[in-house]
């Protein structure tokens, strides 16, 4: 597999990858604190970055995290009593806000000298999706965006194949391919019927415009197809949205041996 000119980093396993990425992020967080500014970490929910989040919590034990912002990529939308779409309840097992609170901020704050404040978790809002990119831009952009790829259709955030490559945050009708991938991402779903049919997401253009650095993380044998598609593309391929990493400033592909074995 070849990725053209984009850097590719290979690791023996997901733990090694997560530790290396956590080291890069921790260095940036420390530098931002010294400079007296916020550090925005772009985060996916789900499986791909779990080893990174765990390693980051270990590395940042005892640190001041009051300037850290967890900028999530997306959130599920469900119909409210009036039929209008609204963000999933954070208590729901699949809520991206809930994931950020429980699996990212929670472990980080448990050992922090100064925790991430409650207002330090950002998500796009279905009531005004475009405002999210404006907020990210006003904050100076995302210092490092962790990207993940859908296993079967290459979606990144909730952007399915064929999404506008320059698009901003939007309300996404989730295709069946993405919803099937989400059955594995959130295993408490008992059937496809339980997976929400809409989400609000950063757009592909948001990722490109707002990222100072981007790291596409591919871990495990289930991501072999994704690794092959992104590596062989050699550039952006509209049929595999995660290939947007090729368009990002300081974009890199990080994968473990199992994902690279395809």
Region annotations inferred by a language model:
Residues 154-204:
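Class I SAM-dependent methyltransferase SAM-binding "motif I" and its flanking Rossmann-like core
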Residues 38-48, 52, 135-165:
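A glycine-rich beta-strand to alpha-helix segment
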Residues 55-64, 87-88, 161-169, 233:
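A glycine- and small-aliphatic-rich helix-loop capping segment at beta-alpha/alpha-beta transitions
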Residues 1-6, 16, 65-148:
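Ligand-binding beta-strand-loop-alpha-helix segment within the catalytic cores
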Residues 6, 201-262:
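ATP/nucleoside-binding phosphotransfer catalytic cores, i.e., glycine-rich phosphate-binding loops
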